């Protein structure tokens, strides 16, 4: 899946935004959307029948990175001196996207002659003479390289990251600790299961009833229920297993916690949002992708990637 970049600018400078988009999409690594792009209205984030803030929220949930373009739109008096600064709405959008995507995933592309408020210093800044094609290309390429080097599954402020963290700490980590430290799993019936592999099953898409989704998948697999003492936890846990042989045991888990993604998004967006719309489904798909990427990061960080595999449902059979 291509990383998505949102470009915001004043309506007077859409011409520059289009040039920036063209540079960003040259190597086909990013999918770029310009706000209020009149030349490609169908691909625009903002629609006439939507509230501005609602659409801005939708775009932040649908994007991985944000670039705001600051040009010499307004004249202001700063301590008795006349200076040029970007429009207030551009600064608002910059703050909004930093709050949603994180500081490292946003950039401010500004004209050389612009006055920058001290409050925005410290974010990724790229200055250029907007009328010089070579300067503009160099500045945009600097931003592009910065985005390319951002961790693919970095922890962010989205609900999926929190859910992945909770799932890892409460299921994957203690299960793997038990397998590693005890050289397998000793169930409550006294049977030892060695050479264990944990498979985390991920649905291709999220529906409102995730439990039913997973039950349908579970019905297609012949499994047994096994209980064992959680490592470091004063309680038992029941898991589904598939024993391919006497020596090998595959542990199957369906992370129903991802139902929280659906409810989190439905609570973030206005109540009148169309849950069957392409935008809504795309947001859910990207959140599921973020859940998987974040979970994989935790698994690899703790050294469990040899015994834990993440499998999508269409690769299960």
Curated annotation (Swiss-Prot):
One of its GO terms (molecular function) is nucleotide binding. Keywords: Antiviral defense, Hydrolase, Nucleotide-binding. It catalyses: NAD(+) + H2O = ADP-D-ribose + nicotinamide + H(+). Residues 160-316 are annotated as: STING domain. Pfam families: CAP12-PCTIR_TIR, prok_STING. One of its GO terms (biological process) is defense response to virus. Its EC number is 3.2.2.5. Residues 4-128 form the TIR domain. InterPro entries: CAP12/PCTIR_TIR_dom, Prok_STING. The keyword Nucleotide-binding applies. The keyword Transit peptide does not apply. 3',3'-c-di-GMP binds at residues 171, 234, 253. NAD(+) hydrolase activity is strongly stimulated by c-di-GMP, weakly by 3'3'-cGAMP, very weakly by c-di-AMP but not at all by 2'3'-cGAMP. Self-association of TIR domains is required for NADase activity. In the C-terminal section; belongs to the bacterial STING family. Effector protein of a CBASS antiviral system with NAD(+) hydrolase activity. CBASS (cyclic oligonucleotide-based antiphage signaling system) provides immunity against bacteriophage. The CD-NTase protein synthesizes cyclic nucleotides in response to infection; these serve as specific second messenger signals. The signals activate a diverse range of effectors, leading to bacterial cell death and thus abortive phage infection. A type I-D(GG) CBASS system. Binds 3'3'-c-di-GMP and 3'-3'-cGAMP, but not c-di-AMP, 2'-3'-cGAMP or cUMP-AMP. Upon activation by c-di-GMP forms filaments which hydrolyze NAD(+); filament formation is required for enzyme activation. Forms homodimers; in the presence of c-di-GMP forms filaments with an ordered array of parallel-stacked subunits. The N-terminal TIR domain mediates NAD(+) hydrolase (NADase) activity. The cyclic nucleotide binds in the C-terminal bacterial STING region. Upon binding to c-di-GMP the STING region closes around the ligand, which is bound by residues from 2 adjacent subunits. STING-STING interactions are the main drivers of filamentation; rearrangements in the STING domain allow reorganization of packing of the TIR domains, forming the NADase active site; cross-filament contacts strengthen the assembly. This is CD-NTase-associated protein 12. It comes from Aggregatibacter actinomycetemcomitans. The gene is cap12.
């Amino acid at each position: 899946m291509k990383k998505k970049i949102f470009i915001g600018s004043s309506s007077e400078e859409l011409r520059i935004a289009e040039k920036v988009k063209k540079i960003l999409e040259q190597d086909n690594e990013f999918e770029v959307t310009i706000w209020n792009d009149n030349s490609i209205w169908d691909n625009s984030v903002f629609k006439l029948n939507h509230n501005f803030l609602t659409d801005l929220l939708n775009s932040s949930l649908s994007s991985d990175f944000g670039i705001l373009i600051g040009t010499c739109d307004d004249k202001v008096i700063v301590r008795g001196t006349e200076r040029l600064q970007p429009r207030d709405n551009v600064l608002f959008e910059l703050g909004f996207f930093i709050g949603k995507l994180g500081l490292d995933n946003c950039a401010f592309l500004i004209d050389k002659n612009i006055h920058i408020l001290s409050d925005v210093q410290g974010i990724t800044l790229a200055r250029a003479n907007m009328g010089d094609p070579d300067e503009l290309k160099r500045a945009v390429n600097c931003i592009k390289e910065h985005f390319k080097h951002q961790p693919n599954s970095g922890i962010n402020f989205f609900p999926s990251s929190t859910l992945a963290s909770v799932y890892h700490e409460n299921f994957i980590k203690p299960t793997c600790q038990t397998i590693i430290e005890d050289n397998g799993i000793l169930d409550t019936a006294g049977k030892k299961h060695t050479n264990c592999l944990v498979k985390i099953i991920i649905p291709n898409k999220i529906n409102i009833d995730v439990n039913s989704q997973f039950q349908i998948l579970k019905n297609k697999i012949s499994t047994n229920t096994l209980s064992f003492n959680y490592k470091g936890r004063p309680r038992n846990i029941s898991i589904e297993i598939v024993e391919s042989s006497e020596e090998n045991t595959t542990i199957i888990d369906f992370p129903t916690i991802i139902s929280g993604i659906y409810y989190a998004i439905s609570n973030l967006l206005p109540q009148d949002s169309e849950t069957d719309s392409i935008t809504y489904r795309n947001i859910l798909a990207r959140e599921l992708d973020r859940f998987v990427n974040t979970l994989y990061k935790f698994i690899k960080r703790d050294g469990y990637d040899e015994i834990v595999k993440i499998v999508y449902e269409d690769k299960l059979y």
